[in-house]
């Protein structure tokens, strides 16, 4: 009632918590059955959690895993992203522009990011977002406080970086070659 709607398009379990996944899935499926939600997903679940989720009845009804993902935080590329792709479950990347502060500044000032932005006629922020969106399975939810930024984010749908540009970004910010802890903000 407070939301002034009869249903939600998607309801996310934000943290794993102490409730067994089977009970969580049952509750989500009951909300779908009652028409309160159209779909459900999870947030901040790593590969082992997703495997466990998909092993419970209806766990494979999960529509998305929302995780931290940006050029400076690529740990999900090692095993979570391939697992989700194999199971046709999209990645919803939160903080795809690296939040704010010193990390974001260091990414934006990186010489490769700057060079690609200049050559492509886009902003360094758009380079960061284009990198995250290079795979079809990734949905990005960048924070935008100004109309100008919303429009710049929207324009990234038409940005196509070259293999050489992606390679330069990969060399500047390599994905891990081993399992890492899931980054969380």
Regions found by a protein language model. Give the residues of each.
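Active-site groove signature of glycoside hydrolases
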Residues: 1-19
């Amino acid at each position: 009632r407070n939301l002034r709607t009869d249903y939600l398009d998607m309801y996310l379990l934000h943290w794993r918590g102490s409730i067994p996944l089977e009970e969580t899935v049952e509750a989500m499926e009951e909300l779908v059955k009652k028409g309160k939600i159209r779909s459900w997903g999870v947030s901040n679940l790593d590969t082992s959690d997703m495997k466990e989720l998909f092993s419970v009845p209806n766990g494979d009804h999960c529509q998305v895993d929302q995780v931290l993902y940006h050029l400076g935080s690529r740990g999900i590329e090692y095993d979570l992203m391939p697992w989700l792709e194999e199971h046709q479950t999209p990645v919803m990347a939160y903080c795809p522009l690296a939040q704010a502060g010193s990390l974001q500044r260091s990414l934006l000032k990186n010489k490769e990011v700057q060079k690609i932005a200049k050559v492509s006629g886009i902003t360094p922020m758009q380079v960061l977002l284009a990198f995250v969106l290079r795979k079809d399975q990734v949905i990005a939810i960048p924070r935008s406080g100004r109309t100008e930024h919303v429009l710049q984010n929207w324009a990234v749908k038409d940005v196509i970086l070259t293999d050489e540009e992606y390679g330069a970004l990969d060399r500047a910010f390599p994905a891990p070659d081993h399992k890492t802890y899931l980054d969380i903000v």
